Amino acid sequence: MVILYAILAIIVILAAVLLINAAITSAKARKLEGNHPTFTDEELKTYAETFSRMLQCATVSVKDTHDDTEFAKLRAVVEEAFPLLHQKAQRQLLAEDCWMYKIPGKDTSRNILLMSHHDVVPAETEGWDYEPFSGAIVDGKVYGRGAADTKGSLCAILFAAEEMLRAGITPPVNLYIVSSHNEELGGDGMAATLEYCQKNGITFEVILDEGGAIVEPPLAGMNCEMCSMVAVHEKGRLKLKCTVKNESSHVSLTAFKGNPVERMSQFIQEITTKNIFIRRLHPETRGLFTGLAPYCKLPMKLLLSNLWLFGGLLTKVLPKLNATAGGMGGTTCNFQTIEGSVNSKECTASVMLRNVNEEDLKADVAAFKAVAEEYGITLETERDEYYAPADMASPAYAYPMDCLAKVFPRFPAAPYILPAGTDAWRLTPVCNCVLRFAPTRMSKQQLGSIHAENENLDISAIAEAAAFYKYLVRNYK
């Protein structure tokens, strides 16, 4: 009986601790109240018309070539719409059409960078309610390829700079604005930017690029309308070529069974069904959960407020929710191609490993290699890129998060790991705090329209994003 009472006491104490932690989490959290930026009809009309003109420029980037026709058209639109920026900022083109503006600040020894890209992916007319490059303005929205990815944030950045110059505001530090012309291809625009910065000794305290946005709550049952999701890390890429060959006749007693295609298939089956990679609750994911916990309902609030107890469970459960959630826990593996036939003497496959942590990746590759050796498969590295995470302990990270609380007080903000790819990784050698975040508000439909039909943004979302950029720059310390 004593044991039973002891067990019950432990359960009661544990439940009390969990509930107290949840209550403390809520008590310490920022209250979601306050006013968001508002705009006159005339201001919104100006934003809409300029944004529409930018979307009418079909700046589709094409591999291995650059036709400047539509890009030149966009440059002309931007020069006309933002005259003060082009009069007062230092401007140059890198590569064929990567824009770089510099607005000197009061402290010319320090730099911040707002970046975007103005190239877009192709768009077919089929499936669109309006022509993809019409820039149609309908019901408070502007439609067109590139609206969300990422001419919207670029338009907001340019408006912010123009409006500050019109008001006679000098940024506290040097403000750089960079927009690439071939981000969608993984082109040389940002590579040229990095080369220029390194050659001229330019480093940045903080960089803001695309990636995260202001979106509908990522977790069910949250007590908020939208969330500011700030990507502080981008998963690295390791591409391997896997090769298996038929052994020569003098090794016919080999332990390997089956022809190359069979062995490769068995290898892929084992890799994709076994959990051979390290999984953990990374700091970025921990920050995501703790940032959103106060605004969740029970029982989710209880789980996220007590990661000391439930962290391991969440790490195991996340892959079962969806691929994006699962990818936050560690290395993911995606076989992309396989070549060979039953009668061929060899079979090859390419695989992409996306990793969160560089040290974990070393162990993951060793585990991957061990399985490959069981099937006589050799590995060759074709691509190896690791992207350093932003320093979440730095003032450079804390400041934009504080700006989000000031400009969008009704939306919680939290960090996360970006599963997609951006140009921002190229600039990690010149900045310890690269944030993949554009302050554009998007519904699920708008987020899903990226690289798809009916891409659009609200006019007010562009104006709000410009207000955020202005606040961030003019109050920078």
What is the predicted role of each segment?
Residues 118-119, 271-275, 369-377:
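A common structural junction motif
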Residues 92, 107-109, 215-216, 277-345, ...:
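An extended, acidic, His-containing surface patch that forms the Zn2+-binding/catalytic region
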Residues 142, 148-229:
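Acidic/histidine-rich catalytic neighborhood of metal-dependent amide-processing enzymes
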Residues 1-9:
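Feature marks short, highly hydrophobic, charge-poor N-terminal signal-anchor/signal peptide-like helices
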Residues 191, 199-362:
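Midchain, well-structured core segments that form catalytic/ion-binding scaffolds
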Residues 18, 159-166, 266-270, 471-474:
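Short glycine/serine- and small hydrophobic-enriched flexible loop segments
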Residues 8-145, 166-171:
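Acidic/His- and Gly-rich active-site-bordering loop/insert found
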